[in-house]
Curated annotation (Swiss-Prot):
Descriptive protein name: UPF0228 protein MA_3119
Domain of life: Archaea
Region Disordered: start-end pairs: 35-67
Similarity section: Belongs to the UPF0228 family.
A Pfam family recorded for this sequence: DUF963
Record's compositionally biased regions (Low complexity): 35-66
């Protein structure tokens, strides 16, 4: 009986020891709580953009405040004498410093066409006749060229008998201008450019010394203000 009692005590002691061991194991293996998340609900504020609305100024313009817009000459209308050919026009202009590249429109037809050349000996009589017949001429001043005056004639009277009789009386010929439009270019391309009025006047004075050129008109980029219109 004593032996049996000892066995039971050993069994109970073993069970108690095993229970303690189990409890110790449970406590020592309790998992670390990693379920608490890192608070990432407050995002980094990336919604504030970098201010790129103010561009870098790479287009610093050349100040044109001293340039009068009405002095920018974009082209010229050149009035050549009757019979001047296109090749003669080109050859003539090549002899002058045109300042800028240009494009030629030969024989432009939107200008007065007809004229007479009156020598100084007959100019008084012819002018007297033309003043009586005011519809015979265009309201354009006569151009003095050497020993002659160039008078622009209205197309309405070129078949008028009295006008033809006057031509015969003073041995005059009715002739046609050859007009050429010049457009200055920025380069060799089609863009219209301009030259200064100062250069245009210099060029006009030089060209009008040519025996084949009567007069030159300017075509302004911004036409001068005319209070009468």
């Amino acid at each position: 009986m004593v032996e049996m009692s000892n066995v039971r005590k050993e069994i109970v002691a073993f069970i108690v020891l095993l229970s303690l061991l189990l409890l110790w194991t449970l406590f020592t293996q309790a998992p670390i709580n990693t379920s608490t998340p890192v608070n990432t609900s407050t995002p980094v504020n990336t919604s504030t953009p970098v201010n790129t609305s103010t561009p870098v100024n790479t287009s610093t313009p050349v100040s044109t405040s001293t340039i009068d817009p009405e002095s920018q000459v974009a082209g010229m209308a050149i009035q050549f004498k009757n019979g001047t050919s296109e090749s003669e026009v080109k050859s003539t202009l090549q002899n002058y410093n045109m300042t800028q590249n240009y494009r030629i429109t030969f024989d432009a037809n939107h200008y007065p066409e007809y004229y007479i050349m009156v020598n100084k000996e007959n100019i008084t009589d012819v002018k007297g006749k033309l003043e009586k017949e005011k519809t015979w001429t265009e309201p354009i001043p006569a151009i003095e060229k050497g020993n002659y005056y160039i008078i622009t004639i209205s197309e309405r009277v070129i078949h008028n008998k009295n006008f033809i009789m006057m031509l015969s009386k003073y041995n005059l010929q009715l002739e046609k201008f050859v007009w050429c439009d010049i457009r200055f270019l920025y380069s060799d391309g089609p863009l219209t450019y301009w030259i200064s009025k100062e250069d245009a006047i210099r060029l006009k004075n030089e060209l009008e010394q040519n025996e084949n050129i009567f007069t030159i008109r300017f075509d302004y980029l911004y036409p001068p203000y005319d209070p009468t219109t």
